[in-house]
């Protein structure tokens, strides 16, 4: 029997409507692709068992959130408790790339993370299967953005052709697990501090 601890990792996928968030989620979890997905209202999630670095077992919840502005307010309620945030843009859509920083900032405002400076993000430039003439966002521009936001890992992907999706989500799982463990340790430290303060108070309040 394995003694390995199983963790539940929550991963949020953000980005403009139509960049391929739902397609990426289904490609990774189910290894399937469809062009018939409807716009996500609020949020939806799928789960997948993952093994990180060969010996760490976890259940990853991949949350797909609304990209359309009229549905965004429904999705922010699901940001809290996230262990990693994936920011997706479409390499054929300049505005979706320009909005990456806004999505990151919105997440940090609503997610209430313990340490915004160190919280893990991953950027995915999707639809690299598109014809070269239709690609607008260069890899260099994406690398510069990723660096400016704190050296965020960047992957160019194709949900349609299953390019780089598994590799990207391996990094996402690793980052999420590290964040999950850091949050757990911080909670345990705070809990132990609270217990020690209470015990010290009881010891100092003796009756004379």
UniProtKB/Swiss-Prot annotation:
Q: Where is this cross-link: Glycyl lysine isopeptide (Lys-Gly) (interchain with G-Cter in ubiquitin)?
A: 147
A GO molecular-function annotation? protein-containing complex binding
| InterPro entries per UniProt | P-loop_NTPase, Small_GTP-bd, Small_GTPase
Please tell me whether the keyword Magnesium is annotated for this protein. no
The biological processes this protein is annotated with in GO are: cytoplasm to vacuole targeting by the Cvt pathway; endocytosis; macroautophagy; piecemeal microautophagy of the nucleus; protein localization to vacuole; regulation of protein-containing complex assembly; regulation of vacuole fusion, non-autophagic; retrograde transport, endosome to Golgi
Q: Where does GTP bind?
A: 17-23, 33-40, 67, 126-129, 158-160
* Gene3D superfamilies reported in the protein's UniProt record: P-loop containing nucleotide triphosphate hydrolases (3.40.50.300)
So which domain of life are we looking at? Eukaryota
Q: Give residues where Cysteine methyl ester occurs.
A: 208
Lipid-anchored residues (S-geranylgeranyl cysteine): 206, 208
Note the SUPFAM superfamilies from the entry. Answer: P-loop containing nucleoside triphosphate hydrolases
CC annotations in GO: cytosol; fungal-type vacuole; fungal-type vacuole membrane; late endosome; mitochondrial outer membrane; mitochondrion; multivesicular body; vacuole
Per UniProt, subcellular location reads as:
Late endosome; Vacuole membrane
Its UniProt miscellaneous note says: Present with 5530 molecules/cell in log phase SD medium.
Subunit composition and interactions: Interacts with IVY1. Interacts with YIF1, YIP4 and YIP5. Interacts with the HOPS complex. Interacts with the class C-Vps complex. Interacts with VPS35. Interacts with VPS39. Interacts with the GDP dissociation inhibitor GDI1. Interacts with CCZ1.
What exactly does this protein do? Answer: Ypt/Rab-type GTPases are key regulators of membrane trafficking and intracellular vesicular transport. They act as molecular switches that convert between GTP-bound and GDP-bound states, and regulate virtually all steps of membrane traffic from the formation of the transport vesicle at the donor membrane to its fusion at the target membrane. In the GDP-bound state, Ypt proteins are predominantly cytosolic, solubilized through the interaction with a GDP dissociation inhibitor (GDI).
Q: Return the protein name.
A: Ypt/Rab-type GTPase YPT7
